[in-house]
Amino acid sequence: MLTRVEQDATDREATVLGVDHNWRPTARWNIRSRLLGSRIDQAGDRVQDLGATVWADYEMEDGWRQQWIAMHFGNDLQINDFGYLSRNSTNYLHWEVRKRFTGLPDASRYSSKDWRWRVSSSHNNHGDKLNDQFRMSREGQLRNGSYEYAQINVNSAGLSDMLLRGNGVVRLPANFNTYFEYERPRKGDWAHETELETFTGGLAGNRKLGAGAGYTATYFISDAFSIYAGGYALYTPDWLVWQREDLVGGFKRRQFDLSAGLDWVVDDRHELRVKMQAIALDARVQHAWRFDPQGYALAATDTVEDFSVRNLGFQVRYRYELAPLSYLYVVYARGGYEQRTGTEGVEDLLQDSFRLRDDEQLVVKLSYRFEI
């Protein structure tokens, strides 16, 4: 794929090329490779670079599989003009073993289980180790139609070359995180989703434990009409937030996300959907840090202030089918974002978020299919 994007407002011209290759040398092997290149001209300057990825999957006996992945992204590779790249300057390797269990005893509540074990290593192009990781996960399909997923990541100590935004590196201690998700499909009038997580991180490493918990319930008034509501609470004891230069604040974060909505298929041609999400975040400073050239943290006397964030997104979306594959869309959207110095408490912030009205839009779109 070749793309070219011109942005007159920023005097930017981006050319990105991606070439994919898929090779199956035997029935058991599947090898996928991709070569990427970008050339960016902006304000009279030109940068260009390359990247490559290789995925190799091997099917073994009795449901066992192995996977190898290798990635390299150059320092100046930029593909976000046509896709998404979380970071450049990356060299990544991983090896994964999987086992799928089927044919479980009739007494088992599971119809199948997928276990995965993975080891990986990530470095930047300057030779700095970002981290090594061991991951173990299990995916389960239950006989009643429910779904489970559990995962644990154990991360080695390493460096962050992004936290200071070009002003140096940060040495981070070893940490871990766990995640659990459970989805129960509709049974009677109700469906349920639950999420749980625990984690460590920041400069505290494994000395401080954070946690998150979420729950969403869906009520079916009929097969065509359902409403849902849910929330997610998050506590982070050592949240690192860049301030300026090599100054970082260590915050205690409390956050709550609230979501609600409805889905109504009025008939074969009419559809109405309503979605709302509100976020309240309270961050209270615990430490101020600066970093030496090797990335070691030094206690700073700079003033770092508490802050709070509230955010709202609300949308009403109506769709009418004019003809097969031809639709009329009417969308009303409203929302806002505000960050303040100081703290107010998550409960007050969540209530205040419903008063946000920074943006308000009404969009009408017609999509019509013509036959020639």
Predicted regions and their residues:
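Aromatic-lined, polymer-binding surfaces characteristic
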Residues: M1-W23, N30
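Exposed, low-structure sequence patches enriched in small/polar residues
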Residues: A14, R34-I372
